[in-house]
């Protein structure tokens, strides 16, 4: 049985203190991700990060034109980490189908790491990024992996791929809706955590049933 935490847990990324020389760009990304995890994307500022890392106020601008560019880089890193996490969960093969494990891991991540999830899926950074940007590539890699877990069955290659993309989008839309409604307190008060898990199971079953259809 899957259980979800509806309150964000403490991120594994800890805010870094003084910058001790080295890769400032990397230090800024890590510090931004830690701030996002703790207080959300809107809390990130160059001035605060510069004070935290004990560098000049001008130093961040040597690596990023503005805070939006830094947050786009942080979102790219977050997508890469998230994709690796989902693949590791699927590889454990503990219970359920690969698709079910990934779906439950997706929702669990969104509920436990609300700030990071909002940076990835509920901010303008992905929409504003060029289609060939590292951010779009990282986001697309996760979607393609999600698609790979949907069996096209006996359908022809072209028709099967179109159906797989359509079903994957519908499933992700459902999972995203569960995360956002739970995070914003929009689910009915009587809905228990186990019911949320059952809802995810229903979404997965609907996706698997859709992939079994030949029409």
Question: Which residue stretches match the model-derived regions?
Answer:
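Hydrophobic alpha-helical connector segments
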Residues: 73, 87-116, 140, 161-171
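Short secondary-structure transition hinges
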Residues: 108-148, 180, 189, 193
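Amphipathic C-terminal alpha-helical segment
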Residues: 148, 152, 171-190, 206-215
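Append "Primarily bacterial transcriptional regulators
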Residues: 44-51, 60
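An amphipathic alpha-helix adjacent to DNA-recognition modules
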Residues: 22-30, 37, 42-43, 54, ...
